[in-house]
UniProtKB/Swiss-Prot annotation:
It catalyses: L-seryl-[protein] + ATP = O-phospho-L-seryl-[protein] + ADP + H(+); L-threonyl-[protein] + ATP = O-phospho-L-threonyl-[protein] + ADP + H(+); [DNA-directed RNA polymerase] + ATP = phospho-[DNA-directed RNA polymerase] + ADP + H(+). It comes from Oryza sativa subsp. japonica. ATP binds at residues 10-18, 33. Pfam families: Pkinase (PF00069). PANTHER family: CELL DIVISION PROTEIN KINASE, CYCLIN-DEPENDENT KINASE A-1. This is Cyclin-dependent kinase A-2.
Length: 292
């Protein structure tokens, strides 16, 4: 850690404290994420080290760059490029989102980052507005924390005992699927897309069952016909209330028809029917976007 200096604590992430820091030689501002691993008596698991070293290879303009990994006895520090604004803060404070061109540009950049990660077989698993970071000067957006869930797992609570949000979690995960893949991230993107347009979360559940019911009451309760295999997922219950699906145009009323078409393809309950990131980038919703 000699080459890095902590400047101030800037937040508490899913895995530990996040500091604003400085590279002593270059003076570059960086973000230092301290990953706490108290439960590991024998130090940092080698699987985590392997996963994290793979992430250093990931380089894309829409992904927050992992610059370095510093390995201490009881913790790991991850050194990232520094960005001080996230999509949640931006949505809370900026009138920009009334302008659908901004929403479209941010959505496109999210998808571009995800397509890159998925092409390298890396999932995010915990996408939410708080880990989409924005560069104020250029309005460019970058995904943070990609691949960390695989290295460290997703805790139920953060180390400060805050509950990790369920609002963006895919139905197959909520239903206990052991094997899931890239569609889980596309579900999260759909939730974030709707939230940017509506300026409020689409499925703000406060428990796993409440989250499922919020999803089913809009998307319809799944069954073997609409989602083959759903009944054999560990947490599926045949006595779930049977909701019909609702027209998304009533749920996201200001979104145009091509936007609604894309959103509906991201929010398919059956993950095998969900659109993938590459196909989403080609969707007609983006045809009038000036791509930088």
């Amino acid at each position: 850690m000699e080459q890095y200096e902590k400047v101030e604590k800037i937040g508490e992430g899913t895995y530990g404290v996040v500091y604003k820091g400085k590279h002593r030689h270059t003076n570059e501002t960086i973000a230092l994420k301290k990953i706490r691993l108290e439960q590991e008596d024998e130090g940092v698991p080698s699987t985590a080290i392997r996963e994290i070293s793979l992430l250093k290879e990931m380089q894309h303009r829409n992904i927050v760059r992992l610059q370095d990994v510093v390995h201490k006895e009881k913790c790991i520090y991850l050194v990232f490029e520094y960005l001080d604004l996230d999509l949640k803060k931006h949505m809370d404070s900026s009138p920009d989102f009334k302008n659908h061109r901004i929403v479209k540009s941010f959505l496109y950049q999210i998808l571009r980052g995800i397509a890159y990660c998925h092409s390298h077989r890396v999932l995010h698993r915990d996408l939410k507005p708080q880990n989409l970071l924005i560069d104020r000067r250029t309005n460019s957006l970058k995904l943070a924390d990609f691949g960390l869930a695989r290295a460290f797992g997703i805790p139920v609570r953060t180390f400060t005992h805050e509950v990790v949000t369920l609002w963006y979690r895919a139905p197959e995960i909520l239903l206990g699927a052991r094997h899931y893949s890239t569609p889980v991230d596309m579900w999260s993107v759909g939730c974030i897309f709707a939230e940017m347009v509506n300026q409020k979360p689409l499925f703000p559940g406060d428990s796993e069952i409440d989250e499922l019911f919020k999803i089913f009451s809009i998307m319809g309760t799944p069954n073997e016909e609409t989602w083959p295999g759903v009944a054999s997922l560990p947490d599926y219950i045949s006595t779930f209330p049977k909701w019909p699906s609702v027209d998304l145009a009533t749920v996201v009323p200001t979104l145009d028809s091509s936007g609604l078409d894309l959103l509906s393809k991201m929010l398919r309950l059956d993950p095998s029917k969900r659109i993938n990131a590459r196909a989403a980038l080609e969707h007609e919703y983006f045809k009038d976007l000036e791509v930088a």
